[in-house]
Amino acid sequence: MTEITGLTAAELSEAIHNRSVSCVEVMDAFLGRINTLNPDLNALVNLMSPEDCLAMALESDQQLSSGNSAGWLHGIPIAIKDLFNAKGLATTLGSPLFQEIGAQQDDPHVARIRAAGALIIAKTNVPEAGLGGHTRNALFGLTRNGVDRSLSAGGSSGGAATAVSSH
């Protein structure tokens, strides 16, 4: 089997649902990848603690063991762009002005992603307020390109682009 972090979302969903891989194994693999790459790339910000991430994954495994799947994203770790609210995570907009404000509820599209079973574990870095051609802000700093560190990760969705390209 391909390394867990190299699977597409559809392949990962199938592997989780046919129980060839557990949600905990998936989370552990992605946390390992994040720990290896994110210090240099700075794609993900406001990452939940590994313990909280693994606890969510264990709960997802227990749901599957009981015959309950929330949907095709069940047990798959997901990061949300730091311009959108995800309950329990700060929505900073890449600005020090908003760093202490935690989201009280999910934005509608985030709620749909969560309802499909996704495990929201982090935010992706953005330029301040999502404005700018490069993902750099005073709060989290520069996001590097996941393929070529000498190139820009781009603006607005630079953190998301880097997270996907460096999988």
Residue ranges and their predicted role:
Residues L41, E59, F84:
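N-terminal Rossmann-like NAD(P)+-binding subdomain of aldehyde/semialdehyde dehydrogenases
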Residues M1-M56:
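An N-terminal boundary/leader segment
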Residues L73-H167:
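Short glycine/serine-rich loop/turn segments
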Residues M56-L58, Q62, A138:
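Short, basic phosphate-binding NTP loop
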Residues S13, H17, D61, V110-A111:
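Solvent-exposed, non-membrane alpha-helical residues enriched in polar/charged side chains
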Residues S60-P77:
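Immediate post-signal peptide segment of exported/extracytoplasmic ligand-binding proteins
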